[in-house]
């Protein structure tokens, strides 16, 4: 986009930011000829420069598993609300069905549920821990690693959503995406989790 607008100051091209969520018939870019008309050769150069500048990716169907861990302080209504919120969030990505699981907030219990999801051919595993992830030796990261999983990143420089864990599990010829969900993902408001999910469901992450 910078290169397009560097061709001439007689035309301005603006668009939504990269990786924005878009819907059918939504305007994603606008073009303005500043003096209302420009030289044809300049226009051709702008068009040539704009090749492959904009791409729209469809959401892909994926088998999603939602695992929630609980401890003695976990309220049943919190678990129920998390399921409802997550289903609505995923519905915006074209996912109409998810597999739900609940277990104790212990490495052995959570590891077992993750392994079960792997065996059930999950494409994406979302884990809401009973407590926030403190470090790589916490319950959720340890449970991921016990299933031969790899931590890609712990923490994200965005608020809300900074206490997120991104990982992957290699199973046969398939890579399973894994997200240790931050507390903000229990809220329906758009946050950093949405930006990650959009990329995963479009095959970009």
List the predicted regions and their residue ranges:
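Alpha-helix initiation/capping motif
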Residues: 1, 9, 38-39, 75, ...
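Short low-complexity stretches enriched in small and charged residues
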Residues: 19-26, 80-83, 134-136
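Glycine-rich, flexible loop/turn motifs
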Residues: 18, 55, 152-154
């Amino acid at each position: 986009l910078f290169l397009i607008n560097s061709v001439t100051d007689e035309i301005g091209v603006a668009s939504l930011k990269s990786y924005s969520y878009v819907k059918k018939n939504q305007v994603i870019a606008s073009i303005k000829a500043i003096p209302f008309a420009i030289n044809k050769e300049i226009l051709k150069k702008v068009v040539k420069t704009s090749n492959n500048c904009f791409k729209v990716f469809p959401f892909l169907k994926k088998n999603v598993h939602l695992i929630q861990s609980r401890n003695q302080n976990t309220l049943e209504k919190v678990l129920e609300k998390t399921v409802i919120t997550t289903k609505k969030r995923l519905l915006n990505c074209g996912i109409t069905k998810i597999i739900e699981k609940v277990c104790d907030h212990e490495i052995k219990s959570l590891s077992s549920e993750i392994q079960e999801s792997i065996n059930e051919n999950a494409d994406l595993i979302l884990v809401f821990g009973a407590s926030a992830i403190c470090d790589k030796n916490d319950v959720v990261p340890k449970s991921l690693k016990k299933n031969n999983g790899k931590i890609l990143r712990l923490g994200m420089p965005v608020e809300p959503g900074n206490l997120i864990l991104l990982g992957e599990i290699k199973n046969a010829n398939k890579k399973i995406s894994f997200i240790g969900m931050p507390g903000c993902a229990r809220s329906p408001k758009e946050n950093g989790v949405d930006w990650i999910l959009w990329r995963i469901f479009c095959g970009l992450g």
